[in-house]
């Protein structure tokens, strides 16, 4: 297959975005990654994002500071006065929601896409993320429309920017199984919202990751 288009992948350092990165390598010509430091308690994930970008051999890895998200109160990911919950995600936006986070992240990635003339932005949102308003299909399609309406590259009639969301209809286990097929080094990923080393194993993110990997590698002895 002749790879023509490029992509910039939102890379947190976690399992889902790592699989997205490895998948993107099979589809796109040049792959860029972008990660964000926004006052998250689990900022250690950025070290994993750096390592994953190096292993994947990306064209360039950008790390962007988004300090104002730390000023927002009410999210357990950034507010030191709130505990990271251990229960599974509820049917409504959980306390780990950072308002407008993915919209902000996509907008910043779109700025890089405009400058570097990158036609695709990859984000690893999936079905288990549905309680988060900015992890749904309607969000992705709306964000794509706004980005294209704002793009200098599009205004110059060079290319449109597409939001690449291949995991929307997939479960965490589906993503892990795809990652296994692609040879993703899961041991180089980090998915604990508490930011501890080793991971706490108690928060919803840790437990969902563990369950997905257990189901994926149930036929092995390791």
Curated annotation (Swiss-Prot):
One GO-annotated biological process of the protein: queuosine biosynthetic process
Cofactor: Zn(2+)
E.C. numbers: 6.3.4.20
Keyword Zinc among record annotations: yes
Residues annotated for Zn(2+) binding in this entry: 192, 200, 203, 206
Pfam families, A to Z: QueC (PF06508)
Keyword terms: ATP-binding, Ligase, Metal-binding, Nucleotide-binding, Queuosine biosynthesis, Zinc
Residues that, per the record, bind ATP: 11-21
Alphabetized InterPro entries for the sequence: QueC (IPR018317), Rossmann-like_a/b/a_fold (IPR014729)
Pathway(s) per entry: Purine metabolism; 7-cyano-7-deazaguanine biosynthesis
Co-factor: note: Binds 1 zinc ion per subunit.
Reactions performed catalytically: 7-carboxy-7-deazaguanine + NH4(+) + ATP = 7-cyano-7-deazaguanine + ADP + phosphate + H2O + H(+)
Gene Ontology MF terms in the entry: ATP binding; ligase activity, forming carbon-nitrogen bonds; zinc ion binding
Family of this protein: Belongs to the QueC family.
PANTHER family from the UniProt entry: 7-CYANO-7-DEAZAGUANINE SYNTHASE
Function: Catalyzes the ATP-dependent conversion of 7-carboxy-7-deazaguanine (CDG) to 7-cyano-7-deazaguanine (preQ(0)).
Listed name of the protein: 7-cyano-7-deazaguanine synthase
Protein's organism: Sulfurihydrogenibium sp. (strain YO3AOP1)
């Amino acid at each position: 297959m002749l790879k023509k288009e490029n992509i910039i992948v939102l890379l947190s350092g976690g399992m889902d975005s790592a699989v997205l990165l490895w998948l993107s390598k099979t589809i796109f010509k040049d792959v860029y990654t972008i990660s964000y430091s926004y006052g998250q308690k689990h900022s250690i994930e950025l070290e994993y994002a750096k390592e994953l970008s190096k292993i994947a051999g990306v064209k360039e890895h950008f790390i962007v500071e988004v300090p104002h998200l730390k000023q927002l109160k009410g999210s357990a990911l950034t507010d030191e006065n709130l505990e990271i919950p251990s229960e599974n995600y509820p049917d409504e936006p959980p306390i780990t929601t950072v308002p407008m986070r993915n919209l902000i992240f996509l907008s910043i990635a779109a700025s890089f896409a405009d400058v570097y003339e990158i036609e695709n932005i990859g984000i690893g949102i999936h079905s288990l993320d549905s309680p988060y308003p900015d992890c749904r299909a309607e969000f992705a399609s709306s964000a794509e429309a706004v980005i294209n309406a704002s793009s200098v590259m599009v205004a110059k009639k060079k290319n449109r920017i597409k939001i690449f969301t291949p995991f929307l209809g997939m479960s965490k286990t589906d993503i892990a199984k795809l990652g296994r097929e692609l040879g993703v080094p899961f041991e180089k990923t980090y998915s604990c919202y508490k930011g501890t080393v080793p991971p706490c194993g108690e928060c919803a993110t840790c437990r969902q990751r563990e369950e997905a990997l257990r189901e994926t590698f149930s036929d092995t002895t390791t």
